[in-house]
């Protein structure tokens, strides 16, 4: 079994916006713009995490929107060269722990049927 890449999971800040916006453009056909990310960072009902590599570059990120007692994972993206290292799993585990601690009724993530890596 291949050794997993070491990352630190931390809350996303304004310092991460450029790298996250670039990651959006790389990973999605309809990416969120930098301005959309700024707006979501300012949303009190949203939380965003980044996975930082050993050089403090963004290897991946994920977003969560909480509405009443419901959790909606809005985004999960990992740099192509960093995939298959458990990064998305680590990001999602933080949200799962949050959902359990705050007794959310559910936590959802929509994935395209063609996204076999996510399924």
Locate each region found by the language model.
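Conserved hydrophobic beta-strand within the GNAT/NAT acetyltransferase core sheet
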Residues: 73, 106-111
């Amino acid at each position: 079994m291949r050794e997993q890449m070491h990352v630190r999971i931390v809350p996303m800040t304004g310092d991460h916006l450029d790298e996250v916006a670039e990651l959006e453009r790389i990973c999605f056909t309809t990416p969120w713009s930098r301005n959309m990310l700024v707006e979501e960072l300012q949303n009190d009902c949203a939380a965003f995490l980044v996975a930082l590599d050993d050089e403090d570059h963004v290897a991946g990120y994920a977003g969560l929107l909480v509405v009443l007692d419901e959790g909606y994972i809005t985004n999960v993206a990992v740099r192509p060269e960093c995939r298959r290292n458990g990064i998305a799993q680590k990001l999602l585990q933080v949200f799962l722990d949050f959902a359990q601690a705050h007794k959310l009724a559910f936590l959802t993530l929509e994935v395209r049927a063609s996204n076999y890596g996510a399924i």
